[in-house]
Swiss-Prot record:
Taxonomy of the source species: Bacteria, Pseudomonadati, Pseudomonadota, Gammaproteobacteria, Enterobacterales
EC number: 3.1.-.-
Binding locations of Zn(2+) 1: H64, H66, H141, D212
One Pfam assignment: Lactamase_B_2
Protein name from the UniProt record: Ribonuclease BN
Cofactor entry: Zn(2+)
Organism for this UniProt entry: Escherichia coli O1:K1 / APEC
Cofactor: record remark: Binds 2 Zn(2+) ions.
Binding site for Zn(2+) 2: D68, H69, D212, H270
Designated gene of the protein: rbn
């Protein structure tokens, strides 16, 4: 998987940062797909500056209904339809997301020529497609807001083909059954258990993408042990009280959570427009003083998971 940041500014766009949108490229060998997390104003234009086709977009997750995370959605939905894309799309978001989308389309005389499903969520598991699952956690923000934990299921270990050949198992369809952990019977009556010829399963990757939030009870469970944690760092340490009063977090709080949760990497985003490039580096230094494995997301930055 890889993350592509399409927008990294808090509240309003700046000359160098658009408002929030994060693309997740699943990079699965047999199931291509793109997921979008939040869709601030101008997201579809940001997408044009990448190599990714909106037709590959099959899921959109909205954290909350503040405009800097939402106002790009109607335009993206309509442009996707006008481009002749017919692949289905599912939107997940808090209560009110259905009314917002349906009202925007109705009042503007717009529609989609592809199947569009809108799922209003609460806290808990959203879905499990057999390859990965997504769970929503409640954030601390003035509006109903969620963070998302994306977990790949463990992958089966490699099949020991040499040992199977030595045991007299012919290569072919039987290998596929054994790789699935099944038990087969050979012509000579012997039973071969696939589990005996599989290496240790390969652990799946885990990712936490926080919505806007101040410190909250669910944060640790959402982030615990993930490979990558994406978290806002709207303001610096000196402005922590102001950040919290508005349902946001400081650099110190994001980094301290990453350390406590034992994450592999912290990526900070949702930077206040008060910070220029020099100020953003100040935010990064504050985080790294607490959690060294921190990166600052800029628009169009790409991170592997």
């Amino acid at each position: 998987m890889e993350l592509i940041f399409l927008g990294t500014s808090a509240g309003v766009p700046t000359r160098t940062r658009n408002v929030t949108a994060i693309l997740l490229n699943l990079q699965h060998p047999t199931q291509s797909g793109l997921w979008l997390f939040d869709c601030g104003e101008g997201t579809q234009h940001q997408l044009l500056h990448t190599a990714f086709n909106p037709g590959k977009l099959d899921k959109i997750f909205i954290s909350h209904l503040h405009g800097d995370h939402l106002f790009g959605l109607p335009g993206l939905l309509c442009s996707r339809s006008m481009s002749g894309i017919i692949q289905p799309l599912t939107i997940y978001g808090p209560h009110g997301i259905r009314e917002f989308v349906e009202t925007a389309l109705r009042i503007s005389g717009s529609w989609t020529d592809y199947p569009l499903e809108i799922v209003e969520i609460g806290a808990g598991e959203i879905f499990d497609d057999g390859l990965r699952k997504v769970t929503a956690y409640p954030m601390e923000h003035p509006l109903e807001c969620y963070g998302y934990r994306i977990e790949e299921h463990d992958k089966p270990g490699a099949l020991n083909a040499q040992a199977l050949k030595a045991a007299g198992v012919p290569p072919g369809p039987l290998f596929q059954e054994l790789k699935a952990g099944k038990t087969i019977m050979l012509d000579d009556g012997r039973q071969i258990n696939g589990a005996d010829y599989l290496a240790v399963p390969v652990p799946g990757k885990a990712l936490a993408i926080f919505g806007d939030t101040g410190p909250c009870d669910a944060a640790l469970e959402l982030a615990k042990g993930v490979d990558v944690m994406v978290h806002e760092a709207t303001l610096d340490m000196a402005m922590e009280a102001k950040a919290n009063s508005r349902g946001h977090s400081s650099t110190r709080q994001a980094a301290a959570l990453a350390r406590e949760a034992g994450v592999g990497k912290l990526i900070i985003t949702h930077v206040s427009s008060r910070y220029d490039d020099k100020g953003c580096q100040h935010l990064l230094r504050e985080c790294r003083s607490i959690f060294p494995a921190t990166e600052l997301a800029n628009d169009f930055a790409v991170f592997s998971i």
